[in-house]
Regions:
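Conserved N-terminal subdomain of the carbohydrate kinase-like
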Residues: 23-25, 49-129, 296-301
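Short, conserved phosphate/pyrophosphate- and ester-handling motifs at nucleotide-, phospho-/glycolipid
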Residues: 47, 183, 251
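Gly/Ala-rich phosphate-binding loop of Rossmann-like dinucleotide-binding domains
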Residues: 48, 154, 263
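Conserved phosphate-binding/catalytic region of the ribokinase-like
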Residues: 170, 198-306
Length: 341
């Protein structure tokens, strides 16, 4: 089973304006949405779109927590949240105007007893399970929580995926996470230098592998993504051009796609595919299967796989190639016509 953990889930209240936000004035929206999320929940949502079962873990509180839990159940997500006695699940306000402005809630305080309940749930995980830890740690929790959880699971064979930043990510590397997914700027922070170009990004990813990471998947916004796998391979995919409607959840979708394609040939997911969303066709940023871009990567079992380009599907038919890198050589581009469904 795949388990995702969202320590501080949220209800995102997304407000759209048709002009710039005027601070200190009354601004009238032209549209609004409520999106239930948090990074781990976003991952579970994309996994569901790919036909993969998962269980979303985390903490909820108050009426907003109950509303979030009901909403996720209505979307078909399986949850096993820990219910807190005090506080309320946070509401984040996202203002979409000429520029994006965010006001994120603090969320409830998480007592040590609640964290212990989560640890006890994770104690039941085995080598057949995948654990995805994503996002920041609330200020009320120990900042070494990620380390504690991975140390607790160390030696059990659980494949741990970590999507976090700075010390949260750096400090779990000794526990050999199966996958980490920094973006290129976060990767630069981890190695202490600005990264320009694929060669520098690849070298930095390998530095993190030397520190313990098995697979390093680097998201690069409009420049696509780069994967350095545990077998030493380097794989590059571009990103189709288009108007960015909402970038929220793009990295979470990439994590979900890697897990669905690399680890579990389940449901309707292609057996060795990792998706990436097209922001131009994904109004809420995540959870739309037809907007997932797929590229083939090596399966854990080690069977023959040419890392061939796997066609992508976008609403507007845009297609981008897959670059196959060879040690010391130039990238090879493999193209293909887009397929439609």
């Amino acid at each position: 089973m795949i388990y995702t953990v969202t320590f501080n889930p949220a209800i995102d209240y997304v407000v759209r304006l048709d002009k710039a936000l005027e601070v200190g004035e009354v601004n009238r929206a032209v549209g609004e949405d409520c999106v239930l999320g948090g990074k781990g929940i976003n991952v579970s949502g994309v996994l569901r779109e790919l036909g993969c079962e998962s269980v979303a873990l985390g903490f909820v509180a108050g009426e907003t927590g109950a509303w979030l839990e009901r909403g996720l159940a209505a979307q078909g997500l399986c949850t096993d949240f820990i219910h807190l006695d005090h506080g309320m699940t946070r509401i984040n306000v996202k203002i979409k105007a000429s520029e994006e402005t965010e006001l994120n809630g603090a969320g409830p305080a998480i007592p040590a007893s609640a964290l212990q309940q989560l640890e006890e749930k994770l104690d039941a995980l085995t080598e057949n399970d995948v654990l995805i830890l994503a996002g920041s740690i609330p200020s009320s929790m120990p900042q070494d929580t990620y380390e504690r959880l991975l140390a607790r699971l160390d030696g059990k064979g659980v494949r741990c995926v970590v999507d976090a930043t700075r010390a949260l990510l750096a400090n779990v590397l000794p526990f050999h996470p199966f996958l980490i997914k920094p973006n290129n700027h976060e990767l630069g922070e981890l190695v202490g230098r600005e990264l320009t170009g694929d060669a520098e990004i690849t070298a930095a990813a390998r530095t993190l592998q030397e520190k313990g990471a098995r697979n390093v998947l680097v998201s690069m916004a409009g420049d696509g993504a780069l994967l350095v796998d545990e077998a030493g391979g380097v794989h590059r995919i571009g990103c189709p051009k288009g108007k960015v409607v909402n970038s929220v959840g793009a990295g979470d979708s990439m994590v979900a796609g890697f897990v669905a394609g690399y680890l579990t040939p389940c449901g309707s997911a292609p057996p060795a595919a990792a998706p990436r969303p097209s922001a131009s066709g994904l109004p809420n940023g995540v959870r739309s299967k037809r907007c997932l871009q797929r590229f083939k990567i090596r399966r854990k079992q080690g069977e023959e796989n040419p890392y061939a380009y796997h066609h992508i599907i976008f609403p507007q038919g845009h297609c981008t190639g897959f670059h196959r890198f060879h040690a010391g050589g130039d990238p090879e581009r493999a193209g293909g016509a887009a397929s439609h469904s």
